[in-house]
Amino acid sequence: MAGGTSFYFAHAIRQLPPAVSFRLITKVGSDALPEVERLRTAGVDVTCYPSEHTVYFENKYGTDANRRTQRVLAKADPFTIEELQDAEARIFHLGSLLNDDFSPETVRHLASRGRISIDVQGFLREVRRMEVYPTDWRNKEEVLGLTDILKLNEHEMTDISGLHDPRTVARQLAEYGVREVVITLGSYGSLIYAEGRFYEIPAYKPTAIIDTTGCGDTYSAGYLYSRSQGIGYEASGKFAAAMCTLKLEHNGPFDRTIEEIRRTII
């Protein structure tokens, strides 16, 4: 089935009122072109570059819904500066799936044209014989110095820092130059660190946990949708958390309304 940051983020954004503009830039093999057309039919503005393969993940979940094992059965080609030469945005959200999707030079080019938002997950994934292993971030200091907004979960924060306390990790990442550090903590909520202050965001209880895949991307969509409108850190975090709760309650990407999001926020 289709998935990944581009899929879950795009579907989440399209469910929200068009208060901000959004364009998806993706890179897929010919096998995924029908899915690109479905996104376009759904109203998503998509720029698609050709790749020899489409990245193909296999996810397996156990009894702990916050943990999964992964394999990568195919990899897409990295993005290039030439492909992104004319890209324009106030915020570029880099939803990397693997650690070679974006070179530091490509990130630097985009940073010269807008603010950089990064979901750290892909930068910490290395593929060896189809198996996915956590790895240290290549050129971490260089890329973090270009990053305005960084999102990571409770496992990724340990992979990137070797530490287990989210507040300590957030402060450390801010020292690299990251302006907004967003750490999601699964059923324990999330933590935002910005301008020297912490914001604790609750996790709203879902009626049922049906599908956790894509929750991180859904959170990013809600957070950036709110922040790009000038909404504050705490309110943006609560909006994003409510979207995650609604996403958990069904299979597939986020498909609810802004009214349902507002009713979920306590």
Language-model features: where?
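Conserved phosphate/ATP/ADP-binding segment of small-molecule kinases
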Residues: 125-198
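Short, charged, surface-exposed secondary-structure boundary motifs
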Residues: 55-60, 125-130, 209-213
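Conserved post-catalytic alpha-helical subdomain immediately downstream of the catalytic base
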Residues: 204-265
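Structural detector of well-ordered beta-strand residues that form the stable sheet scaffold
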Residues: 116-119, 182
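Alpha-helix C-terminal capping segments
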Residues: 11-21, 226-229
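Conserved N-terminal subdomain of the carbohydrate kinase-like
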Residues: 15-95, 100, 105-115, 264-266
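Short catalytic helix/loop segments, enriched in acidic residues and glycine
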Residues: 1-13
